[in-house]
């Protein structure tokens, strides 16, 4: 007679097998009623023997007790977003950029997937067992949704198969099929509950329930699209190969994933998916196109927040017709004058739209737009509403011409348009209240100086009351002065002052980004900081020297040079430093002066280390003059291979690069 443990093991194995056939292979072997019977049998046994319940049991999907709040999980590998293209011309331009960046006219194949309209999640498996799950969040830190993800039957609690890595982070999209969405809303209408506008909102709301038992009742599902952390194992060297391997281990992958050999095949895939879109049974808003070769992906690299080797090719957004009631002009951080159409409110793609961007004067002329016109509105990328065209055949008789301002609508300064540029700009600089507001909002933003609690409404009041003119004035604010603002009590005022004090300690890269120099985003600011090391060196740099920084061309170099040449900007920087803004001094390492076997070498770490953390090893190597890289290439001098080293070790051996183990690294570090 079988023991209770054996019965439980067999039941769990059987249920996992049928979950795999149903959710991954779409080929169920048994009726739903039989699956339910097996599940009931397992539940009854575990109820009688709770000491034998395991975390990966299929019964553990039903949800734990409600959470008071979500804790945070920091992504070990950032969850980047994708750049978008919206037409064939833009995709072909992306294809050309990829081809141009690759050397020796290498052939590129593309892995094409559906762009699911759901919620991006990260799921970490250790030794094949699901241990945590998180939302994308800001790309660096997400919310811990482990308890909720465990309730989604499509997601395996335990991977099955061979050669499963010790640590594997699966990334993908949680979404709600149309049928499930309609059922949720039908139930909500009947019971007086919340009715969701679209399946994505319903999926997000379901996944972020503090009570996992509610999530368990929602018919969420999941498709994998990539990998994050990989330790103690190997994966295929192509994106498609990795997805197919995940499928073997029990992770759901869309059967619409397709390998395309050319740009023409990609376009054919795009149009086929667009044609099939209404019959898929779930929402998508485009296709995702990725370079299939992992080696080519490494060559192409990343920009600030997106890979160069992938793009989202969005479908045309839904469109509606409405009337333009007025055109107003907004002033941005750099003085750009942007015309905005004020519309008769209309629902577009589930959202009530009352404003739409008109971009610039050229766009108004191209459209032939007049105030009062009937227009077609599109939510470009399903995010930013824009005017597509004017319905000339239905133009009312009382329309009025749109007159682009010659003077700033906020400060009255002259508006100038540089020859060759589409954007007209206010020349008022920081005397313009609008520019001042937007500059200050940028300065305190999370990726700049990161002043917690300093919201847009506070900045608006500070400028309107003439309390603040430059970023340096922010650090002169007192709690007493802040309490004079609307909805600002003594406690909140003190919190803002404390946040400003904390923000004084920053990094050189963040400081440069916060200054708001034209065309200088996060990545460029980081590159400038790394190259020049000090503010003094950067201020003294010529346009020619600035162009030596990776990805800095003549236009960006000119903007940076002109910014520091302006006396008022230098004065603001001096004031900021006088108020205590500071960052760590750069560690200048001259490899030629260091007597170390690692000096001047490009080193790659792979596998797990037992005697020190990887971060500690990197720091020690840098101290000894090494440059630590993240991937193996022909430029790599040395690979340090820990336990369970994977594809990087194989590539190093293929290229004939010197490889040492952890013990040899420790010996050399000690020498």
Swiss-Prot record:
Enzyme Commission number: 6.5.1.2
A Gene Ontology molecular function term of the record: DNA binding
Reactions catalysed, as given in the entry: NAD(+) + (deoxyribonucleotide)n-3'-hydroxyl + 5'-phospho-(deoxyribonucleotide)m = (deoxyribonucleotide)n+m + AMP + beta-nicotinamide D-nucleotide
Keyword DNA damage: yes
Residues engaged in binding NAD(+): 32-36, 81-82, 113, 136, 173, 290, 314
GO cellular component terms listed in the entry, alphabetical order: cytosol
UniProt-listed GO biological process terms: DNA repair; DNA replication
Domain BRCT, residue spans: 593-671
Keywords associated with the record: DNA damage, DNA repair, DNA replication, Ligase, Magnesium, Manganese, Metal-binding, NAD, Zinc
InterPro entries found in the cross-reference section: BRCT_dom, BRCT_dom_sf, DisA/LigA_HHH, DNA_ligase, DNA_ligase_AS, DNA_ligase_CS, DNAligase_adenylation, DNAligase_N
Signal sequence extent: none
Cofactors required: Mg(2+); Mn(2+)
Residues holding Zn(2+): 408, 411, 426, 432
Active site positions, chain numbering: 115 (n6-amp-lysine intermediate)
Function: DNA ligase that catalyzes the formation of phosphodiester linkages between 5'-phosphoryl and 3'-hydroxyl groups in double-stranded DNA using NAD as a coenzyme and as the energy source for the reaction. It is essential for DNA replication and repair of damaged DNA.
Entry-linked HAMAP family: DNA_ligase_A
Family of this protein: Belongs to the NAD-dependent DNA ligase family. LigA subfamily.
Name of the protein in question: DNA ligase
Organism field: Shigella boydii serotype 4 (strain Sb227)
């Amino acid at each position: 007679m079988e023991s209770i443990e054996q019965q439980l093991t067999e039941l769990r194995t059987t249920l996992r097998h049928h979950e795999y056939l149903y959710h991954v292979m779409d080929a169920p072997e048994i009726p739903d009623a039989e699956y339910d019977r097996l599940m009931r049998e397992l539940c009854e046994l575990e109820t009688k023997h709770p000491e034998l319940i395991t975390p990966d049991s299929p019964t553990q999907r039903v949800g734990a007790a409600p959470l008071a709040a979500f804790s945070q999980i920091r992504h070990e590998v950032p969850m980047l977003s994708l750049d978008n293209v919206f037409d064939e011309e833009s995709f072909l331009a992306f294809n050309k950029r990829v081809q141009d960046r690759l050397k020796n006219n290498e052939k590129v194949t593309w892995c094409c997937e559906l762009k699911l309209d759901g919620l991006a999640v990260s799921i970490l498996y250790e030794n094949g067992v699901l241990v945590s799950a998180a939302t994308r969040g800001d790309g660096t830190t997400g919310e811990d949704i482990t308890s909720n993800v465990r309730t989604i039957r499509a997601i395996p609690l335990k991977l099955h198969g061979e050669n499963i890595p010790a640590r594997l982070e699966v990334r993908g999209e949680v979404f709600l099929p149309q049928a499930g969405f309609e059922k949720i809303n039908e139930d909500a209408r009947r019971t007086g509950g919340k009715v969701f506008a679209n399946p994505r909102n319903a999926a997000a709301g379901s996944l972020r329930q503090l009570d996992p038992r509610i999530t368990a009742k929602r018919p969420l599902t999941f498709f994998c699209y990539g990998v994050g952390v990989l330790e103690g194992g190997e994966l295929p060297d192509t994106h498609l190969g990795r997805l197919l391997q995940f499928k073997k281990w029990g992770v759901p992958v869309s059967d619409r994933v397709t390998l395309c050999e050319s740009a023409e095949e990609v376009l054919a895939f795009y149009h086929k998916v667009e044609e099939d879109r209404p019959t898929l049974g779930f929402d998508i808003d485009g296709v995702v196109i990725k370079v299939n070769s992992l080696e080519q992906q490494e060559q192409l690299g990343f920009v600030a927040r997106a890979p160069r080797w992938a793009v989202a090719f969005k479908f045309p957004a839904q469109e509606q017709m409405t009337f333009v009631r007025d055109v107003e002009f907004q002033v941005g951080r750099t003085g750009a004058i942007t015309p905005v159409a004020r519309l008769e409110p209309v629902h577009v793609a589930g959202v009530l739209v009352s404003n739409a961007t008109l971009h610039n004067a050229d766009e108004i002329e191209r459209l032939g737009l007049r105030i009062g016109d009937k227009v077609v509105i599109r939510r470009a990328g399903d995010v930013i509403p824009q005017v597509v065209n004017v319905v000339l055949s239905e133009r009312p008789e009382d329309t009025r011409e749109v007159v682009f301002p010659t003077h700033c609508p906020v400060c009255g300064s002259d508006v100038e348009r540089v020859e060759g540029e589409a954007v007209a700009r206010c020349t008022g600089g920081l005397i313009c209240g609008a520019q001042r507001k937007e500059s200050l909002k940028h300065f305190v933003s999370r990726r700049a100086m990161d002043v917690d609690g300093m919201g847009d409404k506070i900045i608006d009041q500070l400028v309107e009351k003439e309390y603040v003119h430059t970023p340096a004035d922010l650090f002169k604010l007192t709690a007493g002065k802040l309490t004079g603002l609307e909805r600002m009590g003594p406690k909140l005022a003190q919190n803002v002052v404390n946040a400003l004090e904390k923000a004084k300690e920053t990094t050189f890269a963040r400081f440069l980004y916060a200054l708001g120099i034209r065309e200088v985003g996060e990545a460029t600011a980081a590159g400038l900081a790394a190259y020049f090391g000090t503010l003094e060196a950067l201020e003294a740099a010529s346009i020619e020297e600035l162009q030596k920084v990776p990805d800095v061309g003549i236009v960006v170099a000119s903007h940076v040079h002109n910014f520091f040449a302006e006396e008022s900007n230098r004065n603001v920087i001096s004031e900021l430093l006088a108020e205590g803004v500071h960052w760590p001094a750069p560690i200048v390492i001259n490899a030629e002066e260091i007597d170390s076997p690692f000096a001047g070498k490009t080193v790659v770490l792979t596998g797990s280390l037992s005697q020190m953390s990887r971060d500690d090893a990197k720091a020690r190597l840098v101290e000894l003059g090494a440059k630590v890289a993240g991937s193996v290439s022909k430029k790599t001098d040395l690979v340090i291979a820990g336990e369970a080293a994977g594809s990087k070790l194989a590539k190093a051996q293929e290229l004939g690069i010197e490889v040492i183990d952890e013990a040899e690294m420790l010996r050399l570090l000690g020498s």
